[in-house]
Amino acid sequence: MRINPTTSGSGVSTLEKKNPGRVVQIIGPVLDVAFPPGKMPNIYNALVVQGRDSVGQPINVACEVQQLLGNNRVRAVAMSATDGLTRGMEVIDTGAPISVPVGGATLGRIFNVLGEPVDNLGPVDTSTTSPIHRSAPAFIQLDTKLSIFETGIKVVDLLAPYRRGGKIGLFGGAGVGKTVLIMELINNIAKAHGGVSVFGGVGERTREGNDLYMEMKESGVINEENIAESKVALVYGQMNEPPGARMRVGLTALTMAEYFRDVNEQDVLLFIDNIFRFVQAGSEVSALLGRMPSAVGYQPTLSTEMGSLQERITSTKEGSITSIQAVYVPADDLTDPAPATTFAHLDATTVLSRGLAAKGIYPAVDPLDSTSTMLQPRIVGEEHYETAQRVKQTLQRYKELQDIIAILGLDELSEEDRLLVARARKIERFLSQPFFVAEVFTGSPGKYVGLAETIRGFQLILSGELDGLPEQAFYLVGNIDEATAKAMNLEMESNLKK
């Protein structure tokens, strides 16, 4: 943790014992601290408990002030384990909120909630820090233009386009390709937009965080040889950490992303996995602070906490933060206050389907379940909108016919329906795409497909011009020209076999 939120601070060593307090009560991760009269810290100030435990090991626990109790006492939430703390230990008020390192030096590194590196690669080579608590950009600073954020992934750009500076909910179970999709987006924004990414692991499994780091190194998203050329900074607050850390780790990641947007004037991708855990941690802290619970046991400040995080994720005249948030839905109940509050902030939803993953169609994005508020003719244009609607209609009709096909077979369908089914199967396969980050295990070179190329390809399939090509020619290709070339190769191979 950096104490001084300026470009000159040199970390915790700058602590001065000008305003010491004493621990008077410890209840799990919550501490009550007494300060001298007239020396009370502000809400959100970082406190540091220093001392030695019963076996002489040094203790250095950072806390954040949450309540002023009266009688010169404050209640603070610890950001790390409170094991070994005792009443009477000295507490120092740092005079500022938790501040974390920001800038290019954070790329390729893993941090905890306090901005301390946890990857055993030494200290972070920067003195620039920023406080994790700040206001959302003023209305006059916002960029209100509605523009599409091109990802180079066909199914996303055509059917559920992302808004530049928007928020996208990513829904998917285990093993359907969520991590690979996240890594491809990180890779594509770096190549096409010259942007960077920040990944906030909020209350996730330590194993998953480790897997993601290893996969990013394998795929080149994190460059081990030259760490400065990496495209992503990772911030983790895992499941085993106290609720204070899980509640604030999202703000740490967001603070790093804001610096890239506001100072470096870049487009930034911010991943939060999982936004539900942010709410869950807030609920735990709220109960520990003695607040009256609200609906379903959630904190009464749920909407305020969510709003203060989400409103900072936006486009300004300098750059944009586009956020992709994994959303866990407890017991599949979309009316639960946690997902319901999240939905109010989302511009698009990307739903990953286990059925498509089972067919081997990757990315396994469900074209009918995924939605976007950007898919309107006045925003994307008539051509894009019409093509997307026709693709959805074709796939919906194919879905309706599948029961008949399963019972009676294709031959019982009318000529018109048989043609529609053939085109729908081509569309389904053409929605698949080889990924750059998956090259290591598929052997197929990755493809970035521009939006204009994507629209042209689907228009050709819908018009019937490609009815004569086999459907396997459309599987795992980039643009439509590759599909026609693949069809010719398949034909040549079959002729040689004869």
UniProtKB/Swiss-Prot annotation:
It is a peripheral membrane protein. Signal peptide: none annotated. GO terms for biological process: proton motive force-driven mitochondrial ATP synthesis. One of its GO terms (cellular component) is chloroplast thylakoid membrane. Gene3D superfamilies: 2.40.10.170, Bovine Mitochondrial F1-atpase, Atp Synthase Beta Chain, Chain D, domain 3, P-loop containing nucleotide triphosphate hydrolases. Its main location: plastid. PROSITE patterns: ATPASE_ALPHA_BETA (PS00152). Pfam families: ATP-synt_ab, ATP-synt_ab_N, ATP-synt_VA_C. The keyword Metal-binding does not apply. It is an enzyme of class 7 (translocase). Keywords: ATP synthesis, ATP-binding, CF(1), Chloroplast, Hydrogen ion transport, Ion transport, Membrane, Nucleotide-binding, Plastid, Thylakoid, Translocase, Transport. It catalyses: ATP + H2O + 4 H(+)(in) = ADP + phosphate + 5 H(+)(out). GO terms for molecular function: ATP binding; ATP hydrolysis activity; proton-transporting ATP synthase activity, rotational mechanism. It is found in: Plastid, Chloroplast thylakoid membrane. Its EC number is 7.1.2.2. ATP binds at G172, G173, A174, G175, V176, G177, K178, T179. The keyword Translocase applies. Produces ATP from ADP in the presence of a proton gradient across the membrane. The catalytic sites are hosted primarily by the beta subunits. Belongs to the ATPase alpha/beta chains family. PANTHER family: ATP SYNTHASE, ATP SYNTHASE SUBUNIT BETA, MITOCHONDRIAL. F-type ATPases have 2 components, CF(1) - the catalytic core - and CF(0) - the membrane proton channel. CF(1) has five subunits: alpha(3), beta(3), gamma(1), delta(1), epsilon(1). CF(0) has four main subunits: a(1), b(1), b'(1) and c(9-12). This is ATP synthase subunit beta, chloroplastic. It comes from Nicotiana bigelovii. The lineage of its organism: Eukaryota, Viridiplantae, Streptophyta, Embryophyta, Tracheophyta. The gene is atpB.
